[in-house]
């Protein structure tokens, strides 16, 4: 029987997923080392059983990675280069993602890591994927090309307080009684609650049968983005009207959304561009490997709203930037 890794390297601990995963791993007794960029500071918002080790490195600089990998059994790869303050800053993210993934894999191989668990995105390669989704899949291929057993989880829209997708949904529906949206809002997706994502990430670490696999993760509902907005409106008791127009390009949509939400245009643009791709699970093996009580879209929204009401102090540090009014 394969032993469960105990010493875990966590990348992206200041992010929406990473901050929650840090707490979950700590509660289950794993020893966690957080990889933090040289320009960042890890702020822990929730009480932990043991203080995580913090190691500073830059994935674009291979020479900074060996000390971070030393003594680790497994690693979570939760980083991506999307997220510049402007669309121009974001356009070069695919090349940065490739460099980061190659450097990380090389360092992991040299350090003798047994496993990597990567959270990427859904979408079929034949569907003319957006640059964002194509980059996430390319990163998975790079990580799975090496000697370290890499599990790639592919998710669609992740619903959680502070996350870009949920905050876009929240601000648009709260602020706009009438919405003019591109026709892509009719594209189907399979949203998943952030709580379920964390359960799958931890479950992969405990379940050796997931090693080396690519697994789709999604919630129980397959719905359009229009339906997501209407579900949010119903939960909040709001009356909203949505009209589609054929002329809104992703770039124009991103600039418009940036005016009414606090989410930077550099994050909005790749998310909006990806609306044209249907992102639903084609493979449900993970439901047998890691049984999880999946939350509905309505339940995920209710949980996210409850967490939002608690304020940024209850959330990982980077999320606070999406919660300003």
Predicted segments with their positions:
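NAD(P)H-binding glycine-rich loop region in Rossmannoid oxidoreductase-like domains
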Residues: 39-111, 122-125
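Mid/C-terminal beta-alpha module of Rossmann-like enzyme folds, strongest
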Residues: 2-5, 203-267, 278-325
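Conserved catalytic-site region of short-chain dehydrogenase/reductase
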Residues: 84, 122-133, 158-163
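N-terminal Rossmann NAD(P)H-binding glycine-rich loop of SDR-like oxidoreductase domains
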Residues: 2-30
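SDR active-site strand-loop-helix element
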Residues: 11, 35, 78, 116-122, ...
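Conserved glycine-rich Rossmann-like NAD(P)H-binding loop of the short-chain dehydrogenase/reductase
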Residues: 30-37
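Conserved beta-loop-beta element that borders a ligand/cofactor-binding pocket
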Residues: 120, 141-162, 168-171, 175, ...
């Amino acid at each position: 029987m394969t032993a469960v890794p105990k010493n875990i390297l966590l990348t992206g601990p200041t992010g929406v997923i990473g901050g929650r995963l840090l707490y979950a791993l700590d509660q289950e007794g794993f020893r966690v080392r957080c990889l933090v960029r040289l320009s960042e500071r890890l702020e822990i918002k929730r009480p932990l059983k043991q203080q995580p080790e913090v190691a500073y490195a830059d994935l674009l600089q291979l020479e900074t990675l060996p000390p971070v990998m030393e003594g680790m059994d497994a690693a979570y790869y939760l980083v991506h280069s999307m997220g510049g303050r402007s669309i121009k800053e974001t356009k070069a993210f695919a090349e940065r993602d490739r460099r980061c993934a190659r450097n990380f894999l090389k360092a992991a191989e040299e350090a003798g890591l047994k496993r990597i668990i990567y959270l990427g995105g859904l979408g079929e390669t034949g569907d003319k994927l957006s640059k964002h989704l194509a980059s996430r899949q390319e990163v998975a291929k790079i990580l799975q090309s090496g000697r370290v057993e890499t599990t790639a989880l592919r998710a669609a829209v992740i619903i959680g307080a502070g996350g870009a997708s949920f905050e876009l949904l929240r601000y648009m529906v709260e602020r706009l009684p009438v919405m003019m949206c591109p026709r892509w809002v009719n594209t189907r997706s399979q949203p998943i609650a952030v709580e379920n994502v964390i359960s799958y990430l931890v479950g992969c670490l405990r379940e050796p049968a997931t090693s080396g696999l690519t697994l789709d993760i999604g919630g129980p509902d397959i719905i359009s983005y229009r339906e997501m907005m209407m579900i949010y409106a119903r939960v909040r008791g709001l009356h909203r009207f949505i009209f589609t127009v054929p002329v809104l390009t992703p770039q124009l949509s991103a600039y418009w959304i940036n005016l009414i939400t606090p989410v930077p245009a550099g994050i909005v643009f790749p998310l909006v561009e990806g609306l044209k791709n249907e992102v639903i699970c084609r493979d449900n093996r993970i439901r047998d490997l890691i049984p999880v009580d999946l939350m509905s879209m309505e339940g995920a929204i209710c949980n996210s709203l409850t967490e939002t009401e608690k304020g940024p102090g209850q959330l990982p540090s980077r999320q606070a930037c999406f919660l300003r009014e």
